[in-house]
Structures are given as structure tokens and as C-alpha cells.
């Protein structure tokens, strides 16, 4: 309360003093002089105190920035409530790329101001293209918006405290005051100099209010403003480009875009040099006019060289003093700028015409390193030609080097494939492999290239984090695994475990995946192609069973029985079938160790429903079931035939017994005997046509061995 009263009384005292001083000023000059002196002294004291406080703040900022601690960064970062952008975030990375392109476009638009001056050859005066100056100013203002947005983003972009970098990535400073101090002490001045609308002010404000020789000097000022404003703009592009390549690794996503970007930089330099050539051509002609005016008797008025309706005219003597179409180097040597004056581009208001002509001049001389330039003795003209030659050499070598780098990145895989193919051919020739093996090797390499494009998928996936690798494998394999009916009953966790351990494999046509009697080391899930499986029941004579496998089928189920058996030995199971690829096959392989791990870790794999699914889709169980049904059918047919023959024999015996008392067989006995003999012959023919050579009666037919029953019961 006392503080408020004191403050209120002070305000009243100051007000009353001010009122009394006004009265004294109206009556006494001495008091006025004293009050003025006191006012000046108070202002100087305030300025001195403000200067001391600002210098103290700057020193405090330097000390605080150097000693910015980890605890302060954490506390300020947690306490901040405003939106602070992460310099490593995706938004700023995209914005930096956009801003780099905007800076390059802005640099390409600034030379448009050089096309504003034009020459009126009829009046021999210097004029201005009104349409061009408005267009250049509008385009320049549009690109300046990106600079303003970049400045705003810089005040909202955090930074990593230098003292916190020992803690991994470091702590992001989110204090708005510290961010502003850091930006004001680094790139703020450069950004402000780059965004100042100085060319627009010269074109739209200064030049319209000046006439005569002053306007010529103003055009020179425009030239120097645009030229020197190039410095902060170019200085700002390079660190931004380094920042973009440091955070994201690349500026363009594709090699062709990178090559086009470097070509654009070369063409941009051609455009800039062409614009300077246009402006310097006008400068040289105006210099010739001024010298002619000074030599004229009497000397002409220099303001007549400016195209003004009130003063223009009377410059016909310049046609003889500064000849263009029939140049005279004795009077004035235009040097490399004579072509621009003779072509009429400095007089034309057709912007596309003079733009493309000047662009072609810049591109031609950059590419030829300035060898065709015939300069005069004017020193700045020689410097301009030397700069063109050096810039052309540097830019052309830079363009060729970067284009070669970008284009080589597109053919690296092809070159690697050619080298591998050449090495394979040399190795096959050295080992004297037969032609059929060579064809199979070439076919496999070609098919592998078509499927993978030379990318080592396993190595690529192994370098990724586990969760990302699981998601990628799930995206690639899950939809294909669900085509296998056996996996439809499994839950998500088990499918993720299987997807993580599946390995893509490729097989060419007529290649053997596994042979009967070989150990089975992997379970194969077919995704594309067609296979043939054959079994001979252990090499049994006369036994052959074949099946076709396609997309969604699997083979190597013996490995699943081995993996589910907790008491199985380390020896791998033996394959009961031969599997051969009939065409190019793409599949996923599950190795024995991986299947054993999944079976031991996930007890939900043990279920009766999975047992029935396994039996239904297993080729081994299908073959055994078919052989079992065939054997049962043969037993049934044989039993039925025996019963039929026995019945016929009984009828014959009955007929013979009834006629035993007679001397000759009756007609009925004869019919029964002939029918019995016919049935016997028919049976013999049937059995002979079905089985050749005929097996002895004492050897029963061998059945296919029943597959081992997988242990789907969990051991609790």
C-alpha cells in the first residue's frame, strides 16, 4: 500500500512540476534555459544508464551461453509452454529443403532487375521498361516472403545446449529468450540484409522521382545494390545446404533429380552472367555517350541522355560518335558488349527475346570457358571476362563431377551384376564345368537379379531395429503365410515369430530342392511357382507316387514332427520324397533350428485342431492315406472274388452230386461246369492285366509306412 501511495504522489509531483515549469517558461527565459539544461542532462544520464545496462546484458548473455548447464536446459525446457520446433524434426527438414530451393529461385530472379533499363536508339537516350520493373518487383517480393518465414521459424527453433552433448543427443533448449539471443548473434544480420527490399525501393520509389544525370547514377546504385545483396544470399544458401545434407543425408530423393539440380545450377549461372552482360552493355553505351557529350562543341546537357518527354531529343550526333552497326574502335571500343548492341536486345521490350539471347550468350561462354571473348582495353571488362572463364571452369568441372556421381549411382547395381557375371564365367571356365551346369548357374543369377535387383535383403533387414524388422517381415510374409491353410489357425504372436525367422529363397527350373533319403534341414512354404514331389517308398520296386505343389503348399513336414518332439535327437529327419521345381519358384524357408525354437517357445502350437490341419494338408499323410485306401480296396475286391468263386464251386458240387447216380452228366451239370470255368478264366485275365509280373501268392503286398505322429500335446 505504501508503495502505491508513493508512486501516486510522485506522479502528482511530476505533473505539478511540469505545470509550474510551463508557467515559468512563459515568463522567464532564465528558468527556461535551466530547465532545458536539466532536460538535456537527464536525457544523457538515461542514455548512459541504458547503454550500461545493454552492455551488461550482452556480457551476461555471453557468460550464460558459454556456461549453459544441463540442469538449466532441462528446467527451461520443461517450463516452456510455447511451441518450439525441433531442428532435427521432419517439419524443419522439409522446410529447409523448400527454403534452399526458394533461395536459389530468388537468386535467379534478382538479375531480372538488370533488364529494366532499355536503350531508345531513335532518340539515343536511356529509358525504363515499366512492365519489367513491376514484374521483377512482384517476383522479388514473393520470394522475400520465404525469407520472412524463415526468420520467424528461426525464432521458434530450439538448439542443443553445448554442455549437454555429453548426454547422448543432448538437451533441446526451448527457452524463447535464449533462442532469440542465439539467433540474433549468428545469422540474423545476414538474413535481414538478404531480405531488405532495396531493389524494389530503387525501382519503384527513387527512380520515378529523379531526372537527368541523377537517374543514371540511380541505375548505377541499383546495379551495386543487386550485386552486393547477392553476397548475403549466397552466404545463406551454403550453410543451409550443408544443414540439409547433414540432417537428411540427401537433398534430392532420386539420382535423376540430383543430376537435374546440378544442371539447374549451371544454367542459373548462365542466366546471371547473361543479365550482367546485358546491363554492362548498356553501361558501356552510356559511357560512350557521356564521352561524346564532353567532346562535343558546345558540350551537350547530360540530362538529355535520359528519356524524358520534356528533355529528350537532340542527340543525333551520337550516331557518329558512338557507331554501333559499323563500329570504330578508334572512337570507342565496345569489346565483348558489341554483340548485345548490334543484335538490338538492349532496345527491345520483348522480354523472352532478350532473356533467351542473353542466357544463350552466358551458357555459350561458360561452356567455352570464355575463349571466344574479344575484350577491349577496359579493365573492368577484362575482369568480367576473366571471371567468366574461371567460373566456367569451376562450374563445368563441378557439373561433370556431380552428374557422373549421380548417374553412376543409378548404374551401380548393374555394374555389380556385370562384375559378378564375369567372375562367374571365369570361374566356370577355370573349373571346366559342363554346359548344362553353366546354363543353370546363369539362369539362377538372372532370376535372382529379376527378383531382388541386386539388393541384399537379408543384410539390409539385419541392420534395422527389431520392431521395424518385424513389421517389414510381417508386411512381406504375413499375407503369403495366410495362404497356407496350416497357418490360418495360429495366433498373431506365433505368426510374428514365424515371419521374423522366415528367409526368402529362389529356385530355378529343374532344380532339386531335396531328394528322397536326404536329411531335411528346412521347411519350405511356396509363394510362387510349381513343384513336383515324388516318393518310391524307400526305393521299393513298382511303387511310385507323385503330387504337384503350388502357391500356398508346403513341403518338409518331417521337420515339423521332429521339432515338436521334445525327446527328438539332434539328427535331422530323413526326407521321404524328392521335390523338384518345374518352373521358377519363390518361397520362404524356415530352418530347422528356427522351427525348433518356435515349437519350444510357443506351446500354443500344440493343439488338436492344428493336428487335423497338418494331417489334411500334409503330402506325406495324403500319400499314406491314398495307399491305405487302395490296400483296403484291394483286400475288399479279393475277398469278394473269393466268396463269388466259393459260391460257384458249391453250386457245381451240388449239381454234380445230384447227377452222380446217372451214367452221363446232365445238361444242368454241363452248364454249371462251363460257367465255373469261364469265371475262373475271367478272374485270371483280370488279375493278370492289373499286376504284371504276377507276384507269388505267399508274398503279401507291402504298404507305405505310416508317417510319424507329431506330438501336439503340450507338456505341462
Curated annotation (Swiss-Prot):
Residues 602-617 are annotated as: Calmodulin-binding. It comes from the Eukaryota. Pfam families: cNMP_binding, Ion_trans. The chain crosses the membrane at residues 98-118, 133-153, 188-208, 221-241, 260-280, 380-400. Residues 689-716 are annotated as: Disordered. Residues 1-97, 154-187, 242-259, 401-716 are cytoplasmic. Residues 622-651 form the IQ domain. Residues 119-132, 209-220, 281-379 are extracellular. Expressed in the whole plant but only weakly in roots. GO terms for cellular component: plasma membrane. Acts as a cyclic nucleotide-gated ion channel. Can be activated by cyclic AMP which leads to an opening of the cation channel. May be responsible for cAMP-induced calcium entry in cells and thus should be involved in the calcium signal transduction. Could transport K(+), Na(+) and Pb(2+). Belongs to the cyclic nucleotide-gated cation channel (TC 1.A.1.5) family. The binding of calmodulin to the C-terminus might interfere with cyclic nucleotide binding and thus channel activation. This is Cyclic nucleotide-gated ion channel 1. It comes from Arabidopsis thaliana. The lineage of its organism: Eukaryota, Viridiplantae, Streptophyta, Embryophyta, Tracheophyta.
Amino acid at each position: 500500500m505504501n508503495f502505491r501511495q508513493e508512486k501516486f504522489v510522485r506522479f502528482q509531483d511530476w505533473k505539478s512540476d511540469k505545470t509550474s515549469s510551463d508557467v515559468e517558461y512563459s515568463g522567464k527565459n532564465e528558468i527556461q534555459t535551466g530547465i532545458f539544461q536539466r532536460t538535456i542532462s537527464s536525457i544523457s544520464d538515461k542514455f548512459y544508464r541504458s547503454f550500461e545496462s545493454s552492455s551488461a546484458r550482452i556480457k551476461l548473455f555471453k557468460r550464460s551461453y558459454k556456461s549453459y548447464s544441463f540442469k538449466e536446459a532441462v528446467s527451461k525446457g520443461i517450463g516452456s509452454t510455447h511451441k518450439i520446433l525441433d531442428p532435427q524434426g521432419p517439419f524443419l527438414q522439409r522446410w529447409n529443403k523448400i527454403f534452399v530451393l526458394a533461395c536459389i529461385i530468388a537468386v535467379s530472379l534478382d538479375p531480372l532487375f538488370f533488364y529494366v533499363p532499355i536503350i531508345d536508339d531513335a532518340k539515343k537516350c536511356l529509358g525504363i521498361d515499366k512492365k519489367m520493373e513491376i514484374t521483377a518487383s512482384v517476383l522479388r517480393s514473393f520470394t522475400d516472403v520465404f525469407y520472412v518465414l524463415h526468420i520467424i521459424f528461426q525464432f521458434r527453433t530450439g538448439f542443443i545446449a553445448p554442455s549437454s552433448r555429453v548426454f547422448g543427443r543432448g538437451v533441446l533448449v526451448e527457452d524463447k529468450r535464449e533462442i532469440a539471443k542465439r539467433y540474433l548473434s549468428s545469422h540474423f544480420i545476414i538474413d535481414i540484409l538478404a531480405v531488405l527490399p532495396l531493389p524494389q525501393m530503387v525501382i519503384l520509389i527513387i527512380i520515378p522521382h529523379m531526372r537527368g544525370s541523377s537517374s543514371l547514377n540511380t541505375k548505377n546504385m541499383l546495379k551495386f545494390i543487386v550485386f552486393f545483396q547477392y553476397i548475403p544470399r549466397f552466404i545463406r544458401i551454403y550453410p543451409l545446404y550443408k544443414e540439409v545434407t547433414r540432417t537428411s543425408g540427401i537433398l534430392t530423393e532420386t539420382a535423376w533429380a540430383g543430376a537435374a539440380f546440378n544442371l539447374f545450377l549451371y544454367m542459373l549461372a548462365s542466366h546471371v552472367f547473361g543479365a550482367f552482360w546485358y546491363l554492362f552493355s548498356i553501361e558501356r553505351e552510356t559511357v560512350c555517350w557521356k564521352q561524346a557529350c564532353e567532346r562535343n562543341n558546345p558540350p551537350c546537357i547530360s540530362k538529355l541522355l535520359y528519356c524524358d518527354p520534356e528533355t529528350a531529343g537532340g542527340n543525333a550526333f551520337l550516331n557518329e560518335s558512338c557507331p554501333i552497326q559499323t563500329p570504330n574502335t578508334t572512337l570507342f571500343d565496345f569489346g565483348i558488349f558489341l554483340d548485345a548492341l548490334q543484335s538490338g536486345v538492349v532496345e527491345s521490350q520483348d522480354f523472352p527475346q532478350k532473356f533467351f539471347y542473353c542466357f544463350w550468350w552466358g551458357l555459350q561462354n561458360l561452356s567455352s570457358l570464355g575463349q571466344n571473348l574479344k575484350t577491349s582495353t577496359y579493365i573492368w571488362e577484362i575482369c568480367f571476362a576473366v571471371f567468366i572463364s574461371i567460373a566456367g571452369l569451376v562450374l563445368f568441372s563441378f557439373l561433370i563431377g556431380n552428374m557422373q556421381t549421380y548417374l553412376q549411382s543409378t548404374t551401380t547395381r548393374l555394374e555389380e551384376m556385370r562384375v559378378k557375371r564375369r567372375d562367374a564365367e571365369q570361374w566356370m571356365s577355370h573349373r571346366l564345368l559342363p554346359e548344362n551346369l553353366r546354363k543353370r548357374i546363369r539362369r539362377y543369377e538372372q532370376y535372382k537379379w529379376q527378383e531382388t535387383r541386386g539388393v541384399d535383403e537379408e543384410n539390409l533387414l539385419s541392420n534395422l531395429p527389431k520392431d521395424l524388422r518385424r513389421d517389414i517381415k510381417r508386411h512381406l510374409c504375413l499375407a503369403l503365410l495366410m495362404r497356407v491353410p496350416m497357418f490360418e489357425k495360429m495366433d498373431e504372436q506365433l505368426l510374428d515369430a514365424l515371419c521374423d525367422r522366415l528367409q526368402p529363397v529362389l529356385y530355378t527350373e529343374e532344380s532339386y530342392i531335396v531328394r528322397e533319403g536326404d536329411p531335411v534341414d528346412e521347411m519350405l512354404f511356396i509363394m510362387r511357382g510349381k513343384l513336383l514331389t515324388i516318393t518310391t517308398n524307400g526305393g521299393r520296386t513298382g511303387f511310385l507316387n507323385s503330387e504337384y505343389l503350388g502357391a500356398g503348399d508346403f513341403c518338409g513336414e518331417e521337420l515339423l514332427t521332429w521339432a515338436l518332439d521334445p525327446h527328438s535327437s539332434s539328427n535331422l529327419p530323413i526326407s521321404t520324397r524328392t521335390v523338384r521345381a518345374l518352373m521358377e519358384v519363390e518361397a520362404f524357408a524356415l530352418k530347422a533350428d528356427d522351427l525348433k525354437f518356435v515349437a519350444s517357445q510357443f506351446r500354443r502350437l500344440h493343439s488338436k485342431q492344428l493336428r487335423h490341419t497338418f494331417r489334411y494338408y500334409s503330402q506325406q499323410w495324403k500319400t499314406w492315406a491314398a495307399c491305405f485306401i487302395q490296400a483296403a480296396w484291394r483286400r475288399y475286391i479279393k475277398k469278394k472274388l473269393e466268396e463269388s468263386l466259393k459260391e460257384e464251386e458249391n453250386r457245381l458240387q451240388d449239381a454234380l452230386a445230384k447227377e452222380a447216380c446217372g451214367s452221363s452228366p446232365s445238361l444242368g451239370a454241363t452248364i454249371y461246369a462251363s460257367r465255373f470255368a469261364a469265371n475262373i478264366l475271367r478272374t485270371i485275365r483280370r488279375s493278370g492285366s492289373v499286376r504284371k509280373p504276377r507276384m507269388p501268392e505267399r508274398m503279401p503286398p507291402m504298404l507305405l509306412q505310416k508317417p510319424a505322429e507329431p506330438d501336439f500335446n503340450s507338456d505341462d
